[in-house]
Amino acid sequence: MASRFEISQQIYNSAYAMHSAHSHSYYELYYLMNGSCNMFIHDNTYRMEAGTILFIPDNVLHKTTYLNNAYHERLYIEFTDDYISDLIDILGFEQFKDTFYMHFFSIPDNHRHEFLSIFSVLINERQNSNALSPCVYKNHLQNLLILLCRYCDNKPASPASLVDTVSIADVSVQKAMNYIMLNYNKDITLDEIADMLHLNPSYFSKKFKAVNGFGFKEYLNTIRINHSEQLLLETDMSIT
């Protein structure tokens, strides 16, 4: 896999919406600087507030839906594991996964300036990159992850923490999403799942979109495409 390091800081108005869930073959560190959003990741939806960082693993489906604030500000870093190889070597890959994968890190106010300083260095370096820049990216990114371990309370993105993390996620929608994740390769219809959950199909359709920010059919197709892409990457299967 090709080496990758990208960093971006952007401000959105309240009308902005991500069109669809997506995944990629590299890691992403997502920092919500201002505003609030619902973060769909893997097969659950979580509430994120300003000052929270989420570590998104490679090949994991995710999507943000911003809530009704005046504006939202977010920063993300996309990177491959060669930029954090020293940290992985020290922790071991399994410990690294347990520490970071799909974890939410809440940055304490008294340490926020340290994180912002690192982000500022990385943004400036990316805008004025040269032959030495990869060394700067690697050193500061690993330092950033170390600070997350040392200073931040974190919660794994799991069903056990779901109630604490997002208040609007409806149990019936979570059950539907879990069912799709397990049965995406079968014929599935909205009416079938609504009946399984003892819900009116129209009500279920509206609830599904309200929780996730995208419709039932879009979610089902995205899950199928994501699994197909992973099969192509990880096996000798072809599309023919």
Question: Model regions: which residues?
Answer:
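Short, conserved beta-strand element in jelly-roll/cupin
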Residues: 23-39, 55
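Regular secondary-structure segments
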Residues: 33, 116-130, 177, 181-184, ...
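Basic/polar phosphate-binding segments, predominantly the helix-turn-helix DNA-binding elements
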Residues: 150, 175, 179-226, 233-237
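All-alpha amphipathic helical-bundle segments outside canonical DNA-binding/catalytic cores
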Residues: 126-143
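A hydrophobic/aromatic-rich effector-binding and dimerization subdomain
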Residues: 1-16, 58-128, 145-159
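Short acidic-glycine-tyrosine-enriched beta hairpin
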Residues: 43-57
